[in-house]
A protein has these predicted regions:
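Extended, subdomain-level signal for the structured scaffold at the beginning of enzyme domains
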Residues: 1-110, 118-124
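Catalytic, metal-anchored helix/loop core of enzyme active sites in primary metabolism
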Residues: 114
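Structural detector of well-ordered beta-strand residues that form the stable sheet scaffold
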Residues: 110-111, 132
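A short alpha->loop->secondary-structure connector
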Residues: 125-133
């Protein structure tokens, strides 16, 4: 098997912001490629942590519960992946907007997964950019 990992690449820190109703399928499809890259390279290329707005357990649409490592306000990193999924409209209030705006200064890149781009739009983080929602 060919080794494609960059030897000088810094470990990338991913924060995965979960909301109640998130898709376990979307979560697995986000984390598994990172885990596989680590395994195949024999290096820690990616690390990730699960986040919620309030530090409380998030429950997926299928009933799986995920205990976050910390709340969003205490997190920083390279990529923030926002994963609301079903019922995202219920998460689109000012608390979420302020939290996402604040987090945009602590993360290098933002990724809206599933319906996450809607929350970025509500927080005005897509203003001035072309985006698909």
């Amino acid at each position: 098997m060919q080794k494609w990992a960059k030897t000088s690449a810094a470990t990338q820190q991913f924060g995965v912001l979960l909301f109640d109703g998130f898709s376990t399928h979307c979560l697995a499809n986000t984390i598994e490629p990172l885990r596989a890259a680590n395994t195949l390279s024999g290096k820690t290329l990616y690390i990730w942590e699960f986040l919620t707005l309030d530090g409380q357990i998030a429950e997926s649409s299928s009933g799986m519960q995920v205990t976050p490592h910390r709340e969003l306000s205490a997190a920083k990193g390279d990529v923030l992946a926002v994963m609301p999924s079903y019922g995202f409209e219920g998460h689109a209030g000012w608390v979420t907007q302020m939290a996402l705006r604040s987090a945009s200064h602590r993360f290098e890149s933002l990724a809206g997964l599933d319906t996450g781009s809607w929350l970025f739009a509500e927080a005005e983080l897509l203003d001035g950019y072309q985006a698909t929602i």
